[in-house]
Amino acid sequence: MPFDPAASPLSPSQARVLATLMEKARTVPDSYPMSLNGLLTGCNQKTSRDPVMALSEAQVQEALAALERLALVFENSGYRSPRWEHNFQRGAGVPEQSAVLLGLLMLRGPQTAAELRTNAERWYRFADISSVEAFLDELQQRSADKGGPLAVPLPRSPGTREQRWAHLLCGPVDAGRSNAGVEPVPAGVETLQERIGTLESELASLRATVQWLCQELGITPAPASMPQPGLPAGNGSPGS
């Protein structure tokens, strides 16, 4: 039977870990499967996240263990250090397009169909807003034998024209709280946030690689604050 959130709802930290794996698999494939350090950075990044979280390494490990029991993630044993992959599409029994929409809803909170189409640009290219709405409707009408509904439309907030959607992977949604303080983000800012998020993830992957190389070679990495050769300690500027 596919994953049933009504029977085993995800915690916010589990949803963040799962959705981060889903995101990075598509947007930063060179860093996937993900190391624990890379995953921690991706979960806590300040761009493309609502809410922004500050998970600890222990919380990420606990979330991974719980998700593994639900068959939604698994550890890839083909690497020297542990790396993780998601199994959401198969575990939840949904098509690729629906998995993309649910991943975005887990990462960014409630969104309109138009916002989802824009935010999905680096994940999957939907032909139009109507196709996004069709998959959202399918998620809402999902039958009980398939695990029940996975998405729900929210009541329109005063002064808004478009309906927003929320996922149900963490259980029922508090529509009042979900509609509080909604402000649209300009498209240019969204693009910049995506680029910053990608750079943060790539930097975390590079740090993990350097750490592993230093361990293999028996080298202690120098702190970033150490003065450069030929420069006096202090402000580090010539002639100071």
UniProtKB/Swiss-Prot annotation:
Name of the molecule in the record: UPF0502 protein Veis_2102
Similarity comment: Belongs to the UPF0502 family.
InterPro entries per the UniProt record, alphabetical: DUF480, WH-like_DNA-bd_sf, WH_DNA-bd_sf
Lineage: Bacteria, Pseudomonadati, Pseudomonadota, Betaproteobacteria, Burkholderiales
Entries under HAMAP family matching the protein: UPF0502
A matching Pfam family: DUF480
PANTHER family for the chain: UPF0502 PROTEIN YCEH (PTHR38768:SF1)
